[in-house]
């Protein structure tokens, strides 16, 4: 600003009108245009680069070193740029604002001056200086000029700010609308927008309403400050702002102890060895691929070497520190000394401890020894660098495959013909697939275990030609199937093998089967036999065909003819006499017992984790046998309806051969022939697995003495049984199933086929879900249903073989034979041999008596022995549960038939109705068992009818009238609970008593039972009150409240119904006496109803 003032006062000009400036003074210094200080550089001479105090007053009028405007004549042509013109215009405007007036008339910049007519300035001569200003004029002009410049600067900056913020406002308007309903929070990653919670939105609304209530709007405004007169504003100064630095958080390093690292190494390598996987060990950008290898029964680490990859180098391998640590971890576990002769092909890369190898060996750099091969009988270390000539003398222990490939490649190239095709060969089959093709073809024509074995070659050549042809035919079929699945593009090989198979097989077949078919059904031309004879004649006419399907067609035709012949005979007879159910001569195959991974070195089944989880069966459903007491306690196995003699006593072997032969004679029962009890039908056809086994003549096959074994699980119902060692227990004692739980051996046999990972869930499910539902001596239908449930959850158990199951038709019992055999003979044998066949008993469409047989016997004897005791105990438990919700819930969920024992007393029925017991039970079984829910609904209706009656004899009559219907509903419900037979027995007793009383009354006798019923009811009615008084105060209050509410609701309904009944009776009486209805009588229904309501 001071510069503009100086420019307005005086300026040197040249004659041509151009502005000039003294760059340096006489002393050669640069001068400041404000304070006239001298500097050595032009940069420091600028006012902004030093503490400039401005020009002094005394120096102002004498200052002539500034670049000032030229005063030019009007006739002098001036060529100026647009920027210079604009600057002169601003200076002129500033002079006009300050009110400065030049002498006579002159212009600044392009303004013409007419001081004289002639040119006032010659070339290189300064123009005349205007008159000297006083101190006050200079101060006033400075102040006005400063204010004008400040005002124009503020206006320009305001316009720029508004322009900049208008653009920013447009960009941020959409974002501000989006963020209106949310909040911006600061997180570790920066600022984030989140949707505002209801409380935050409420706070924003309150703050908005508070601002609106004031009626004031805050707008940005500018505050101007007056500066001192001795200072001049040079505009804003750019200031540096602080920048938020990103904080880099270093991840915490994981530190493990040596023991933890060893455990980690052991677990990782164990998993890798179990699944035959390779592990890559990385340490400081050096990697080693390793795996587990057993050498002489010891687990050691094997490292991938260069000659594994087909690279022969002087130094075969290198180990990083981590690999060395893992190798030492495995090598130090054993002190076994490995002879050098036992280390052979396949052991290259195995890491031993050098001290654990005996024999000739090369040196090693540390205590480890990595096998490479042998040279002159000496073991070579892979990490040692060998000479070039010695490298090819080493017999590497894994280079056999490379030798085969090199020989094959060289021979194939030598034998192939020159290419005469018109195309370029393109590789479409990988070398690995070529190796598979060569192996398959070699296996078809050359079935040797090792291709280098001369003994295998001799054995193959010694076989007859027919066996060799048969092998090529069968093996070729397997090769075709394998190649079609693995290498679909190898159709040229499969086509040639198939062509060879068709040629080597004899195209003719034996016509003996056709002759047998003609002998069987040739004379019959009715129905389907006419078509069968036509098919037989067509086959005879097509003899000599080259396809193999004709032979299978002959065999199928023969079986079809036999089946139709037998079926026709059976339908014609229409009886059981034609039933044949021969047992298979071959034992069924159980693949779980054939898997090598589940067998030990002796071929015995290895339970693994299954044996550990099988303890749940032993602890709950088995009893220990103490050999010290002898086996006499277990020789006779009692059942509820009889006994069965076990062969456990035969484990004691006498020295006398005669006595030993006597033990082979069993205890025979009465033999029973084949009848309808022995068969099961579905849709009119026999279901053979659910029927008894017969011989070829139709007679039943009877069981013989079954020899015992010690600590074995005997499975297999046909053929020779299979013995599986029971899981080893801590005590090592013998176990026998508890009475009524002999069917646990079926689930034990299913455990063999369950995988180890599912063994825990399987045993828990059987113990906690299946066994409580079945209980003691369940029916075969219930056992089959449980097996069906397990087969859905664990599909592997469908093929599980069953123990031998014997059938006793006289007592309607199934005996599941365990390892202690049976001395009792004469039982029928059930044909079902697998779980899937046993599940057929669960079908509702299956007809036959055997599905209702008990597995172990019925419960009649047990019920008769302690019927009264158990019934009284259950009634007492039921009364206690009326006012105890937890006990009541347990009874409802486990034994719902206990609720039916409430029919022994009307007071128990009324108490259960008032407490809502039946309603709770109905809700529980509504979607679980509809028959059970219907039975409970009938009990609720019966208890309501009993509650409405006030007379004891009438209440008993209501109960007696509903007994038959209640029994029919109970028969349709689930019968797997333990209390079902007790309830059924109580119902039978009450029904027989009612029928006997009715016969006595019909014959004219008087039945006096009122006093007995009153005494029983008096005794039972006190028990609910007695148990109610024993409850806690809070429980008593809650129970009384529930009873009060239910009684109030019930008597409100009863009172209304009785009132309606009484009004109906009164209407009939009024109409009969007065000839009109009581509503027309002065003593209307309102008064009568009011009086009656008072009475009731």
From Swiss-Prot:
One Gene Ontology term of the molecular function aspect: cysteine-type endopeptidase activity
Q: Does the keyword Hydrolase apply?
A: yes
Q: Which GO terms describe its biological process?
A: proteolysis; symbiont-mediated suppression of host innate immune response; transport of virus in host, cell to cell; viral translational frameshifting
Give the GO cellular component terms, alphabetically.
host cell plasmodesma
Post-translationally, this protein is described as follows, namely: Potyviral RNA is expressed as two polyproteins which undergo post-translational proteolytic processing. Genome polyprotein is processed by NIa-pro, P1 and HC-pro proteinases resulting in the production of at least ten individual proteins. P3N-PIPO is cleaved by P1 and HC-pro proteinases resulting in the production of three individual proteins. The P1 proteinase and the HC-pro cleave only their respective C-termini autocatalytically.
- Signal peptide range in chain numbering: none
Q: Which residues form the Peptidase C6 domain?
A: 734-856
- Pinpoint the Peptidase S30 domain residues: 255-397
Entry keyword set: Host cell junction, Host-virus interaction, Hydrolase, Inhibition of host innate immune response by virus, Protease, Serine protease, Suppressor of RNA silencing, Transport, Viral immunoevasion, Viral movement protein
Motif Involved in interaction with stylet and aphid transmission: positions = 450-453
Q: What EC numbers are recorded for this enzyme?
A: 3.4.21.-, 3.4.22.45
Entry's transmembrane regions: none
**Active site positions:** 307 (for p1 proteinase activity), 316 (for p1 proteinase activity), 348 (for p1 proteinase activity), 742 (for helper component proteinase activity), 815 (for helper component proteinase activity)
Q: Which InterPro entries match?
A: HC-pro, HC_PRO_CPD_dom, HC_PRO_CPD_sf, Pept_S30_P1_potyvir, Potyvirid-P3
Q: Where is this site: Cleavage?
A: 397-398, 856-857
Free-text note on domains in this protein's UniProt record: The N-terminus of helper component proteinase is involved in interaction with stylets. The central part is involved in interaction with virions and the C-terminus is involved in cell-to cell movement of the virus.
Entry similarity comment:
Belongs to the potyviridae P3N-PIPO polyprotein family.
Q: What is this protein called?
A: P3N-PIPO polyprotein
């Amino acid at each position: 600003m001071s510069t503009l003032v100086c420019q307005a006062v005086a300026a040197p000009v040249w004659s041509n009108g151009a502005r000039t400036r003294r760059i340096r003074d006489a002393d050669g210094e640069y001068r400041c245009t404000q304070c006239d200080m001298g500097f050595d550089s032009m940069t420091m001479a600028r006012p902004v680069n030093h503490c400039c105090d401005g020009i002094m007053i005394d120096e102002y009028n004498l200052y002539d070193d500034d670049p000032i405007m030229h005063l030019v004549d009007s006739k002098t042509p001036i060529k100026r740029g647009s920027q210079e013109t604009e600057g002169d215009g601003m200076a002129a405007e500033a002079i006009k604002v300050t009110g400065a007036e030049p002498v006579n008339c002159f212009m600044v910049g392009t303004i013409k001056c007419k001081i004289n007519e002639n040119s006032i300035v010659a070339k290189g001569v300064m123009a005349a200086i205007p008159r000297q200003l006083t101190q006050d004029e200079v101060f006033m002009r400075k102040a006005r000029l400063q204010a004008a410049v400040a005002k124009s600067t503020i206006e320009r900056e305001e316009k720029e700010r508004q322009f900049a913020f208008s653009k920013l406002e447009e960009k941020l308007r959409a974002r501000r609308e989006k963020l209106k309903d949310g909040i911006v929070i600061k997180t570790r990653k920066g600022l984030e927008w989140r949707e505002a919670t209801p409380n935050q939105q409420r706070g924003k609304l309150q703050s908005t309403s508070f601002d609106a209530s004031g009626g004031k709007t805050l707008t940005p405004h500018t505050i101007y400050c007056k500066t001192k007169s001795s200072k001049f504003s040079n505009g804003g100064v750019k200031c540096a702002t602080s920048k938020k630095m990103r904080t880099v958080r270093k991840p915490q390093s994981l530190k493990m102890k040596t023991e933890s690292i060893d455990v980690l190494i052991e677990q990782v390598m164990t998993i890798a060895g179990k699944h035959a996987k390779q592990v890559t060990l990385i340490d400081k950008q050096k990697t080693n691929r390793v795996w587990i290898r057993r050498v002489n029964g010891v687990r050691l680490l094997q490292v991938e070497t260069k000659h594994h990859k087909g690279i022969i180098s002087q130094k075969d391998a290198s180990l990083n520190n981590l690999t060395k640590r893992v190798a030492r971890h495995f090598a130090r576990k054993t002190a076994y000394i490995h002879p050098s002769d036992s280390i052979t092909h396949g052991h290259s890369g195995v890491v031993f401890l050098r001290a654990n190898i005996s024999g000739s060996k090369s040196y090693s750099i540390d205590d480890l020894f990595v096998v490479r091969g042998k040279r002159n009988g000496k073991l070579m270390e892979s990490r040692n660098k060998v000479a070039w000539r010695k490298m090819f003398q080493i017999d590497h222990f894994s280079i056999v495959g490379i030798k085969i490939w090199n020989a094959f490649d060289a021979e194939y190239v030598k034998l192939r013909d020159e290419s005469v095709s018109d195309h370029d060969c393109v590789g479409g089959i990988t070398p690995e697939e070529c190796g598979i093709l060569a192996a398959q073809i070699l296996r078809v024509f050359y079935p040797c275990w090792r291709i280098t074995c001369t003994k295998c070659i001799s054995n193959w050549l010694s076989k007859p030609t027919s066996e060799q042809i048969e092998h090529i035919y069968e093996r070729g079929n397997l090769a075709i199937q394998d190649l079609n699945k693995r290498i679909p593009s190898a159709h040229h090989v499969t086509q040639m093998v198939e062509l060879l198979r068709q040629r080597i097989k004899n195209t003719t077949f034996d016509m003996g089967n056709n002759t047998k078919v003609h002998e069987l059904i040739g004379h019959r031309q009715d129905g389907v036999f006419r078509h069968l004879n036509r098919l037989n004649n067509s086959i005879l006419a097509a003899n000599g065909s080259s396809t193999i399907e004709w032979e299978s067609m002959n065999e199928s035709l023969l079986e079809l003819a036999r089946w139709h012949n037998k079926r026709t005979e059976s339908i014609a007879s229409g009886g059981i006499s034609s039933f044949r159910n021969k047992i298979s001569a071959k034992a069924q195959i159980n693949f779980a017992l054939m898997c090598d991974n589940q067998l030990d070195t002796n071929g015995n089944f290895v339970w693994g984790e299954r044996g550990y989880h099988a303890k749940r069966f032993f602890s709950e459903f088995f009893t220990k046998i103490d050999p010290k007491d002898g086996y006499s306690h277990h020789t006779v196995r009692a059942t509820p309806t009889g006994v069965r003699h076990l062969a456990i006593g035969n484990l004691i072997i006498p020295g006398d051969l005669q006595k030993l032969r006597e033990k082979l004679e069993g205890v025979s029962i009465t033999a029973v022939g084949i009848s309808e009890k022995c068969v099961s039908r579905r849709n009119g056809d026999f279901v053979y697995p659910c029927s008894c086994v017969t011989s070829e003549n139709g007679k039943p096959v009877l069981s013989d003495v079954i020899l015992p074994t010690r600590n074995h699980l005997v499975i297999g119902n046909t053929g020779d049984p299979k013995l599986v060692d029971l899981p080893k227990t801590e005590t090592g004692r013998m176990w026998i199933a508890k009475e009524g739980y002999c069917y646990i051996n079926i689930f034990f046999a299913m455990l063999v086929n369950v995988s180890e990972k599912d063994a825990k869930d399987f045993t828990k499910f059987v113990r906690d879900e299946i066994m409580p539902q079945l209980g003691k001596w369940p029916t075969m239908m219930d056992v089959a249903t449980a097996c069906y449930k397990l087969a859905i959850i664990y599909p592997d158990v469908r093929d599980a073989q069953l123990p031998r199951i014997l059938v006793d038709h006289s007592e309607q019992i199934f005996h599941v034979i365990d390892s202690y055999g049976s001395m009792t003979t004469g039982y029928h044998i059930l044909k079902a041999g697998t779980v899937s066949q046993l599940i057929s008993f669960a079908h509702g469409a299956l007809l036959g008596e055997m599905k209702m047989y008990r597995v172990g016997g019925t419960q009649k004897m047990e019920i008769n022995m302690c019927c009264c005791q158990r019934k009284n105990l259950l009634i007492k438990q039921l009364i206690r549960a009326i006012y105890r919700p937890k006990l009541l819930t347990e009874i409802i969920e486990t034994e719902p038939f206990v609720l039916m024992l409430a029919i022994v007393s009307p007071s128990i029925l009324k108490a259960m109705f008032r407490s809502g017991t039946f309603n709770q039970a109905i809700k529980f079984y509504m979607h679980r068992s509809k028959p059970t829910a219907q039975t409970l609904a009938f009990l609720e209706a019966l208890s309501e009818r009993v509650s409405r009656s006030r007379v004891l004899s009438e209440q008993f009559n209501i109960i007696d009238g509903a007994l038959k219907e209640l029994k029919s509903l109970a028969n349709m419900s689930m019968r797997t609970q333990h209390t079902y037979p007790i309830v059924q027995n109580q119902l039978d007793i009450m029904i027989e008593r009612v029928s006997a009383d009715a016969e006595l009354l019909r014959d004219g006798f008087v039945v006096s039972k009122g006093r007995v019923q009153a005494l029983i009811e008096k005794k039972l009615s006190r028990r609910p009150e007695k148990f109610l008084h024993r409850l806690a105060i809070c429980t008593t209050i809650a129970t009384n409240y529930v009873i009060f509410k239910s009684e109030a609701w019930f008597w409100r309904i009863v009172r209304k119904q009785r009132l309606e009944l009484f009004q109906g009776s009164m209407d009939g009486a009024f109409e009969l006496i007065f000839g009109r209805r009581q509503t027309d009588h002065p003593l209307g229904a309102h008064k009568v109803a009011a009086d009656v309501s008072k009475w009731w």
